[in-house]
C-alpha cells in the first residue's frame, strides 16, 4: 500500500535518485548512498519552513515518488494563497500505474484544505510526457515560464 507523507532526512538519498532518473536530472544531481551537505542543508530549510513541504510516496518501505508543495501568499486573487508544485518525480517502474494521479490528487487536496485559490506548476520544455500528464490531471498551459541560472557564490 502506498502512503503519502512528509519526507524525512533519511529519504533524501532516495529523493535525489528519483531526480537523477531522467536525462536532465542526470546532468545536475549527485547520486550517493549518503547525500552531501548541500542536499541536507536544503532539506533542513524546507523541513523547517511551514510554507514548504517535501513529500514522498512510500510503498513497502521504499520511496517511489516525490514532489515539493510550497504555499505562496499573494495579493492577486483578492489576497489568496496559491500552491506551487515542483520537483515531481515518479520512479520509472511506477509510471503509468496511477501513482502520479494519486500523488497529485493528494497535493491538490492539501492545497484546498489550506484555503489555496490556485495550484500552479512549471515543467521543463524538454519533458513533453510530463506536460501531457499535467494536462491529463487538469492543469492548463496558461503562462510561459522563464528562469535565469545564477553562478554559484
Model-flagged regions — what are they?
Residues 3-17:
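A short beta-loop-alpha structural element at the N-terminal edge
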Residues 92, 120-130, 147-151:
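Conserved beta-strand-loop-alpha-helix junction that forms the acyl-donor binding cleft
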Residues 54-56, 62-71, 89:
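Conserved beta-strand in the GNAT
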Residues 87-90, 96-109, 132, 136:
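Conserved acetyl-CoA-binding loop-helix of GNAT-fold acetyltransferases
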Residues 104, 111-123:
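Conserved GNAT acetyl-CoA-binding A-motif
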Residues 20-42:
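Conserved GNAT-fold acetyl-CoA-binding loop/helix
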Residues 44-56, 84, 140:
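A short helix-loop-beta-strand connector motif used in the catalytic cores of GNAT acetyltransferases and
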Residues 2, 61-66, 83:
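Glycine-rich phosphate/pyrophosphate-binding loop shared by adenosine-nucleotide-utilizing enzymes
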Amino acid at each position: 500500500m502506498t502512503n503519502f507523507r512528509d519526507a524525512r532526512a533519511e529519504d533524501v538519498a532516495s529523493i535525489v535518485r528519483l531526480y537523477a532518473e531522467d536525462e536532465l536530472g542526470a546532468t545536475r544531481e549527485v547520486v550517493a548512498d549518503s547525500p552531501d551537505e548541500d542536499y541536507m542543508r536544503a532539506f533542513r530549510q524546507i523541513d523547517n519552513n511551514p510554507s514548504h513541504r517535501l513529500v514522498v510516496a512510500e510503498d513497502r518501505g521504499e520511496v517511489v515518488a516525490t514532489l515539493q508543495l510550497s504555499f505562496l501568499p499573494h495579493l492577486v486573487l483578492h489576497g489568496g494563497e496559491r500552491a506551487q508544485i515542483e520537483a515531481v518525480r515518479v520512479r520509472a517502474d511506477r509510471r503509468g500505474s496511477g501513482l502520479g494521479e494519486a500523488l497529485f490528487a493528494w497535493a491538490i487536496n492539501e492545497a484546498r484544505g489550506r484555503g489555496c485559490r490556485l495550484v500552479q506548476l512549471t515543467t521543463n520544455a524538454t519533458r513533453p510526457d510530463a506536460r501531457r500528464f499535467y494536462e491529463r490531471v487538469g492543469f492548463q498551459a496558461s503562462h510561459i515560464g522563464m528562469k535565469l541560472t545564477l553562478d554559484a557564490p
